[in-house]
């Protein structure tokens, strides 16, 4: 796999929770893969709607031979998300992970609760 992968958390799917670091990194890749709600928030050169994860995992190595890719997932990619799956399946993969604001943080903030409670 010649090119780098950016795995970015998209937060809740609104512009307010898509972090500037994620937007900046995703502008630098050649292809962004995400659900339509995230693709609408980005100004990517080339996009592809997220399909079945199993199909994406199967085709990812060949895709990374051709171009750099950014994948946007809901919430935080480090919490019950795609990061672990990618690391386990492709340990040699060069991947930059950009965290996002997850639903647990949003829920806690809405009720004034800390993550320790």
Model-derived segments and their meaning:
Residues 108-117:
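Short, glycine-/small-residue-rich phosphate/pyrophosphate-handling segment
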């Amino acid at each position: 796999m010649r090119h780098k992968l950016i795995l970015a958390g998209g937060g809740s799917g609104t512009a307010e929770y898509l972090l500037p670091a994620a937007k900046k990194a995703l502008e630098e890749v050649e292809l962004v893969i995400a659900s339509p709600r995230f693709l609408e928030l980005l100004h990517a050169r080339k996009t592809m709607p997220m399909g079945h994860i199993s199909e994406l995992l199967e085709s990812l190595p060949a895709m990374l031979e051709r171009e750099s890719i950014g994948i946007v997932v809901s919430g935080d990619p480090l919490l019950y998300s795609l990061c672990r799956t990618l690391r386990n399946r492709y340990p040699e993969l060069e991947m930059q992970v950009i965290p996002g604001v997850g639903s647990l943080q949003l829920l806690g903030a809405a009720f004034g609760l800390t993550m320790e409670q």
